Design a protein with these regions (language model features):
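Solvent-exposed beta-strand/loop surfaces, strongest in extracytoplasmic domains of secreted
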Residues: 1-203
Length: 203
């Protein structure tokens, strides 16, 4: 077979899996199989590979057309072939651990934080709180935190859904608003005459 008469094999590769999670590169999917020579009705041996196996597709509309190339073993008889295979790109999970330090009633409230975070660093985070046990959940405004009475509370954190990540609800943590100790000034130089009661003494 002369170079100008080389045959173009047809077909598509077999994928080791049809879906990946956002953050995974294309080369986490292995390509295998053979193409077919429709002229002679025989299978064509060769090697498949991704054009860019390090590429990390975004979720987009959920389907990504990934480009592959097939290099035939017999390059004198067959042409190199390229094509695309559709794969599903699924959203990835996010994670975070909420924490909140306790404080004393009457002092400035602590600020909740989210640590050990994975996912989209730009995803919106919403904090909320409730009295431990039976309180209704309410939004915690970091810029204008509520004035809470002494007691035990739960802090919640919610990471918002993004184009490539699912939202995440962090496990709540508990924090304590401690009772305050009243301040006072001990009176001095008090005097009383014999026969007076304490009620008669001016403070």
């Amino acid at each position: 077979v002369s170079a100008k008469n080389r045959i173009t094999p047809t077909g598509t590769p077999t994928l080791s899996k049809n879906a990946i999670t956002y953050g995974d590169a294309l080369n986490t999917i292995a390509l295998s199989g053979k193409l077919h020579d429709n002229v002679n009705n025989v299978d064509v041996d060769g090697t498949f590979e991704w054009v860019d196996g390090t590429h990390i597709p975004v979720v987009g509309n959920g389907t990504y057309a990934a480009e592959w190339i097939f290099e035939p073993t017999d390059t004198e008889k067959y042409l190199t072939v390229s094509g695309r295979s559709n794969i599903t790109v699924e959203k990835a999970q996010q994670y975070g651990k909420v924490s909140m330090a306790g404080y004393t009633y009457g002092q400035a409230p602590s600020t909740p934080t989210l640590t050990d975070r994975t996912g989209d660093a730009n995803a919106q985070v919403t904090y909320s709180y409730a009295a431990a046990g039976n309180g209704s959940v309410q939004t915690w405004d970091i810029q204008n935190p509520p004035a809470l009475n002494a007691g035990t509370y739960r802090m919640y954190a919610s990471i918002g859904d993004t184009d490539n990540y699912y939202g995440f609800e962090a496990v709540y943590c508990e924090f304590v608003v401690a009772k305050a100790t009243p301040t006072y000034t001990k009176p001095t130089d008090l005097t009383a005459k014999y026969g007076q009661t304490l009620a008669d003494v001016t403070l």
